[in-house]
C-alpha cells in the first residue's frame, strides 16, 4: 500500500511553495479591504452568531472568522493543487513511462496504481469543493470553474504550445481565490498579482520544459521549446518574466505600498534575472536550480515583505487583530 510520503511525492508537495505565498498575499489583502461590519461575520459562519448565551467580543469574533477562513484557504490550496498534480500524473502515465527523466515517478514505477491515483484525484476534488462550501457562496459556486481550469491543463500539451500559459492561469487563481474567500468580491489589486503569477509561472515552466524538447517532438507533444527551439523559448520566457515584474511593480504603485514591498520586489525581480543568467540554450545543467530554488526564494521572500508592509506599516491594522 502506498504511503503518505508516496502521495506527497506524487503531487510534488514541495512545489506548493510557488502559489501558496501568493494565496497568503491575497488573503491578507482581503483582510485589509474587508468591510468590518459585524453583520458580515454572521454570513459565512452562522454557528458563531447562533450559539445561545455565548458572548464574544467583536474583535474575538472577527479573529475567529479570519482564522477559520485562513485554514480553509490553505486546505483549498492543498486539495486543489493535489487534485491537479495527481490528475496530471494519471493522464501522462504512458508518456512518463517512456521518458527517462520521468520513468521513476510513482505511477510508471508501480508505487501507486492508476486506480489509486484517479481515486486520490477525485477525493481531492471533493474535499476542495467541500472547503469552498464552508467559506462563502461565491467561492462555492466558482469551485467547478477553478477545478476545470487546473484539470484541463493536463490535456493542453496534447494540442497547443500555450500549455504553459494555461498552467499559469491555474496557479494565478491563488491570490484571487484567497481574496474572494475573505471579501466575497473581486478587486483590481489581487487581479494584478494574478497577472504577475500567470507570466511568472508560464515563464519558469518554459524553462523547465527545455529538458524535454527532444522527447516532446518525438511524441507529438506541444511545448514552446519543442515548437520554437531552446533559444526562442528562453526569449519568450524572458519576456513573460519581464511582464511579471512589470505587473508586480504596477501593483506596488497602485496599492500605495511602501519600502518593505519594494525590497520584496527587488528580490523577486533579482531571482527572475538570476534564473535566466544560469540557463542557456547550450547549458541546461542548472535548470532545476532555476526552476525550484530561484522561484521558491522569489515567491516566499516576496510574500514575507508584502505581509511586513501590510502589517508592520499599519496598512492593515485589523490584520494585527487577526494575529494577536
Which stretches of residues belong to each language-model region?
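C-terminal membrane-associated helical module and adjoining short loops/tails
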Residues: 1-16, 111-112, 182, 193-324
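Residue-level signal for short hydrophobic patches within transmembrane helices
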Residues: 4-14, 71, 75, 79, ...
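Intramembrane alpha-helical segments
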Residues: 8-9, 38, 75-77, 82-83, ...
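The first (N-terminal) embedded transmembrane alpha-helix
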Residues: 12-31, 168, 172, 303
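Residue-level recognition of pore/gate-forming positions within transmembrane alpha-helices
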Residues: 23, 27, 77, 125, ...
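Helix-coil boundary and interhelical linker segments in multi-pass alpha-helical membrane proteins
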Residues: 27-74, 127-141, 176-195, 247-262, ...
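Multi-pass membrane catalytic core of lipid/isoprenoid biosynthesis enzymes
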Residues: 65-79, 93-143, 218-264, 304-305
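Membrane-spanning helices that line or support transport/gating and their immediate boundary helices
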Residues: 86-94, 206-213
Amino acid at each position: 500500500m502506498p504511503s503518505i510520503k508516496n502521495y506527497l511525492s506524487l503531487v510534488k508537495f514541495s512545489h506548493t511553495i510557488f502559489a501558496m505565498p501568493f494565496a497568503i498575499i491575497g488573503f491578507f489583502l482581503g483582510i485589509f479591504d474587508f468591510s468590518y461590519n459585524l453583520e458580515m461575520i454572521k454570513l459565512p459562519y452562522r454557528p458563531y452568531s447562533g450559539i445561545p448565551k455565548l458572548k464574544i467580543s467583536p474583535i474575538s469574533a472577527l479573529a475567529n472568522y479570519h482564522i477559520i477562513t485562513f485554514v480553509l484557504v490553505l486546505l483549498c490550496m492543498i486539495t486543489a493543487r493535489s487534485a491537479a498534480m495527481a490528475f496530471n500524473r494519471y493522464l501522462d502515465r504512458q508518456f512518463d513511462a517512456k521518458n527517462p527523466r520521468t520513468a521513476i515517478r510513482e505511477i510508471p514505477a508501480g508505487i501507486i496504481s492508476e486506480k489509486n491515483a484517479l481515486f486520490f484525484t477525485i477525493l481531492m476534488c471533493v474535499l476542495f469543493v467541500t472547503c469552498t462550501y464552508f467559506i462563502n457562496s461565491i467561492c462555492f459556486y466558482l469551485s467547478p470553474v477553478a477545478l476545470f481550469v487546473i484539470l484541463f491543463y493536463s490535456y493542453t500539451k496534447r494540442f497547443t504550445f500555450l500549455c504553459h500559459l494555461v498552467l499559469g492561469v491555474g496557479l494565478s487563481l491563488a491570490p484571487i481565490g484567497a481574496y474572494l474567500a475573505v471579501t466575497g468580491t473581486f478587486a483590481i489589486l489581487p487581479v494584478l498579482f494574478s497577472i504577475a503569477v500567470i507570466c511568472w509561472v508560464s515563464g519558469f515552466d518554459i524553462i523547465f520544459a527545455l529538458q524535454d524538447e527532444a522527447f516532446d517532438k518525438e511524441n507529438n507533444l506541444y511545448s514552446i521549446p519543442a515548437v520554437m527551439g531552446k533559444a526562442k523559448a528562453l526569449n519568450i520566457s524572458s519576456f513573460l518574466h519581464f511582464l511579471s515584474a512589470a505587473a508586480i511593480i504596477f501593483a506596488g504603485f497602485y496599492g500605495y505600498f511602501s519600502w518593505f514591498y519594494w525590497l520584496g520586489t527587488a528580490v523577486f525581480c533579482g531571482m527572475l534575472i538570476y534564473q535566466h543568467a544560469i540557463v542557456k540554450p547550450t547549458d541546461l545543467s542548472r535548470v532545476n536550480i532555476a526552476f525550484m530554488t530561484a522561484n521558491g526564494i522569489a515567491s516566499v521572500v516576496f510574500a514575507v515583505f508584502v505581509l511586513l508592509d501590510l502589517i508592520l506599516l499599519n496598512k492593515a491594522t485589523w490584520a494585527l487583530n487577526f494575529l494577536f
